[in-house]
């Protein structure tokens, strides 16, 4: 029996322990996200106590038009798988096991209809995990832009978030041509989707993943 089948997946809150885990293990340590569903992966640790070894975060889509574009029938029922990270010392199939269990939970316990996720080629990710979980591959996005503030990357929309203190501060520094703030061109991302309600109409044709 595979080791991962003994792992436990739990839905929880976006709490301090989750934030701390993301800061340590995710390549983007930006944790100011509005989580809709937070899942943790546990294994038996020392003295039989559960040890957190993974976090998976679902949010509403970051781009305002993404939900409408990929699921126009009911854009309010779209989630984005925004964060997925595990500790380094996990079996090869641990990530796909984790994601598949979160999908199963969403199907059983919620009325969400559609999941969207992106594999970031900037980080060498091409969506192997999503393909293993039977996500649909829809090709690539256009090349994008990201905001770098003092070496830390933020979504480009941060510049227009004038209702938030950090948005106001970053916008002010940008207008003052602060050298600590840069706009960086990014590679296209791979687009993956999953239909939680199978009978729903799929607007976009699935594509074959091409290795490059």
Predicted stretch roles:
Residues 11-12, 59-179:
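Acyl-donor binding region in acyl/amide transferases
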Residues 22, 35-60:
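Conserved beta-hairpin
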Residues 176, 186-187:
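Class I (Rossmann-like) S-adenosyl-L-methionine-dependent methyltransferase catalytic domain
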């Amino acid at each position: 029996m595979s080791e991962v089948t003994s792992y436990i997946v739990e839905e929880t809150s976006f709490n301090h322990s989750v934030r701390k885990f993301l800061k340590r293990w995710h390549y983007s340590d930006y944790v100011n996200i509005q989580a809709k569903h937070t899942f943790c992966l546990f294994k038996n640790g020392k003295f039989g106590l559960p040890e957190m070894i993974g976090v998976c975060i679902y949010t509403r889509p970051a781009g305002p038009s993404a939900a409408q574009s990929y699921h126009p029938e009911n854009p309010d029922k779209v989630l984005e798988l925004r964060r997925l990270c595990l500790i380094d010392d996990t079996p090869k199939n641990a990530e796909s096991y984790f994601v598949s269990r979160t999908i199963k939970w969403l199907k059983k316990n919620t009325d969400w209809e559609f999941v969207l996720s992106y594999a970031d080629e900037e980080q060498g990710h091409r969506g192997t995990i999503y393909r293993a979980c039977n996500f649909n591959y829809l090709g690539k996005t256009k090349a994008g832009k990201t905001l770098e503030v003092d070496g830390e990357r933020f979504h480009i929309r941060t510049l227009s978030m004038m209702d938030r203190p950090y948005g106001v501060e970053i916008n002010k520094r940008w207008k003052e041509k602060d050298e600590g703030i840069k706009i960086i061109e990014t590679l296209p991302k791979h687009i993956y989707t999953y239909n939680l309600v199978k009978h729903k109409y799929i607007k976009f044709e699935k594509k074959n993943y091409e290795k490059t």
